[in-house]
Design a protein with these regions (language model features):
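Gly/Lys-enriched N-terminal cap/neck module of very large, oligomeric protein machines
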Residues: 105, 122-137, 145
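P-loop NTPase Walker
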Residues: 1-123
Length: 146
């Protein structure tokens, strides 16, 4: 699977682009659980929540009234699906996503790397009980004291 990276400045439509790409991937297969193989990473918790909300909102639109979604035409064309087939896939994917919400991986870059580090903790010689220190003040104080 390819790694797609999108970079853009504030207000340039990143959420729209990422939502479209997420939907394109999630609906590219008849497997309604395919969303669980997608990893979307962004910088802030606010952006993460906004992206999750937008993806669910658009999946709902595609599942209930596809003509109301700005992505409907583009997805039917790109995925080579009839509108009714796209709607069916959206219904099944939305249901699967809501029933297995913990597998809906849209996260911040720090939580992504925290998961990566945890998965290699044993190989790195650490216990799995690692925590991320966001406040740099205690870290600086500790460095000065040593």
């Amino acid at each position: 699977m390819a790694l797609d990276i999108y970079t853009a400045s504030a207000g340039s439509g990143k959420t729209h682009t990422l939502t479209r790409e997420y939907l394109r991937l999630a609906l590219s297969t008849p497997d309604p659980h395919y969303f669980s193989t997608i990893q979307a990473v962004t910088f802030t918790k606010k952006a993460t929540l906004e992206m999750k909300e937008r993806i669910v909102q658009e999946l709902y639109r595609l599942a209930t009234e596809p003509d109301a979604s700005p992505f409907s035409g583009e997805l039917t064309e790109h995925l080579h699906l009839f509108p009714t087939k796209l709607q069916e896939r959206a219904q099944r994917a939305l249901r699967a996503l809501l029933l297995d919400y913990s597998s809906f991986r849209v996260r911040t870059i720090d939580s992504f790397f925290q998961e990566v580090v945890r998965s290699f903790a044993h190989e790195l010689g650490h216990s799995g009980a690692l925590r991320v220190q966001i406040d740099s003040k205690p870290l600086l104080q500790s460095a000065v004291l040593e």
